[in-house]
Amino acid sequence: MMIPAIDLIGGEVVRLYQGDYAQKTNYQYTVQDRQQAYAESGATVMHFVDLDGAKDSTKRQLKTLKTVVNHPSMIIQVGGGVRCEDDVKQLLALGADRVVIGSLAIKQPELVTQWVKTYGCEKIVLALDIKIDAQGNKTLPTHGWIEDSGVNLEDLLAQYQDAGIKHVLCTDISKDGTLTGTNVDLYSEVCAKYPDIDWQASGGIGSLADIKALIPTGVSGVILGRSLLEGKFTLEEAIACWPKTSANNAESNTSSNTGDK
């Protein structure tokens, strides 16, 4: 399934290069127009990142998010600076279907695993940004990739599997925002090792060939941000090159999960 992604600063559509606020690109679209275009092109899930909220949770873009989270035909996942349970409650109450949790999921896994149990595995998405060293070790930097958490991927997932985690958005940070191709080996490895998790691949998608390369890995979703905003291909083209069985399953899950919107 293709998952269009939109990053927001001050209510405007932007992209950061490898998470760097100093390397920001603004796009001349409104978030509402982009969402509607993606819906008309066949998107059933969308991913929004509140970059203001990521910097300061008191500056969350609630007015803007309110206009997009209640879309009748889409599952909406929202992330950016979730630091406490009140943030989770706030986003779910706003209408988000899933809350995406990054740094806190790494720093305080006991707390976040409790949220998985409290709100259900369909409501929480772990956002794990992975740094791979020369020896192949997978560590998890936090707070905009500035801090080394000292935590590796396998140890962290062992804790979350016990809680029944279902959705993990996984980014190889060396690929993010580059359009230079994705880390196929990484996704093949994690999908084989953790088959009960629905993996969302993120970072580096710059062509339809990059999407097709992910098909054998077993990922359930592909995050598309800059590539769609800059017209590298259309969403219709991306959806068309993904296996029909996966698309049908996604549509089935979407219709069952959005019935109360």
Swiss-Prot record:
EC number of this enzyme: 5.3.1.16
Active site positions, chain numbering: D7 (proton acceptor), D129 (proton donor)
Cellular location(s): Cytoplasm
GO cellular component: cytoplasm
One Pfam family here: His_biosynth
PANTHER family: 1-(5-PHOSPHORIBOSYL)-5-[(5-PHOSPHORIBOSYLAMINO)METHYLIDENEAMINO] IMIDAZOLE-4-CARBOXAMIDE ISOMERASE
The protein's name in its UniProt record: 1-(5-phosphoribosyl)-5-[(5-phosphoribosylamino)methylideneamino] imidazole-4-carboxamide isomerase
